[in-house]
Amino acid sequence: MLSAISKVSTLKSCTRYLTKCNYHASAKLLAVKTFSMPAMSPTMEKGGIVSWKYKVGEPFSAGDVILEVETDKSQIDVEALDDGKLAKILKDEGSKDVDVGEPIAYIADVDDDLATIKLPQEANTANAKSIEIKKPSADSTEATQQHLKKATVTPIKTVDGSQANLEQTLLPSVSLLLAENNISKQKALKEIAPSGSNGRLLKGDVLAYLGKIPQDSVNKVTEFIKKNERLDLSNIKPIQLKPKIAEQAQTKAADKPKITPVEFEEQLVFHAPASIPFDKLSESLNSFMKEAYQFSHGTPLMDTNSKYFDPIFEDLVTLSPREPRFKFSYDLMQIPKANNMQDTYGQEDIFDLLTGSDATASSVRPVEKNLPEKNEYILALNVSVNNKKFNDAEAKAKRFLDYVRELESF
């Protein structure tokens, strides 16, 4: 018995709680939702209805396209935000110049019965807007008229005397303020002086026109913006270097070591068989010099047998590996033979006279047999090093000289 009583008391308390939270066992008669003309762009003010995709009473789901709206630029599909069905269509297909926010249909829930559902009164909603504008009272209308009189009496002075752009789209804050004070757009563009760029009407201009703020404050703000919209560089002067800094810069430039060009000059003496003509010897020497030049440039300075040597890497890190590091020039001359101590005119040598030696005796020299006769030549070599551009030029020039010095062994 006690358990039954406790169950009943618990059930009553739960019922009171559910009733308090507006939970009922019977279906609730829900009011329909007003579907207004959507704004498909920030600048859209009016639009048209191309077609309705659903008829009255046909259910639709969230995301379905319920109608197609026409703007001044294109035609856009409008999707449903929630599940529901059309209870009544206020604007039929083909309607033009429908203001944004104006009711165009009523939407009910999917489970609602359209026969028993109550629709809002249509007498006052035919030309209603989504934004309800409060009717001004008698006191407020008198106050606005007084402000307008004051505004018309006091001349409006703008900073640049510009006129409002008649083709501009008013900002939402400006449109709302004009609607609250029963001022049309055409009247505002004609009578209110703009302070925005390119003749744009701002909220401060409307407030100054209504007398809610002084016109001087608007002019001051406009002057400040126009004064600082461009960077003033007239007061900027170039910094002049102090004489000490200039002297230090000159001394640093003078302290830089100047690279002097390097030149090598050598005279090499070598022998060649007398049977070889001079022209043939010159041709062979020219080939030898070219070979030495190619060897000095082509062979790397680093030890090629080292495990750290890589020809591809050396070719990449070397500055302009194909450009010459030095230039050379040479002159080949034959040294004439001295067969006797007398000159070509039959006179004795001055050194023989001073030493008292017999010229006839000294002129006869033993000639060894089986020795081929050789001519003596002198090679005057000049090497100009391009060390101002390449740091390895001098080393390769010295390698070239070492290669040519091998002629002295002959």
Swiss-Prot record:
It is found in: Mitochondrion matrix. Pfam families: Biotin_lipoyl. GO terms for biological process: pyruvate decarboxylation to acetyl-CoA. It comes from the Eukaryota. PROSITE patterns: BIOTINYL_LIPOYL, LIPOYL, PSBD. Present with 414 molecules/cell in log phase SD medium. Eukaryotic pyruvate dehydrogenase (PDH) complexes are organized as a core consisting of the oligomeric dihydrolipoamide acetyl-transferase (E2), around which are arranged multiple copies of pyruvate dehydrogenase (E1), dihydrolipoamide dehydrogenase (E3) and protein X (E3BP) bound by non-covalent bonds. This is Pyruvate dehydrogenase complex protein X component, mitochondrial. The gene is PDX1.
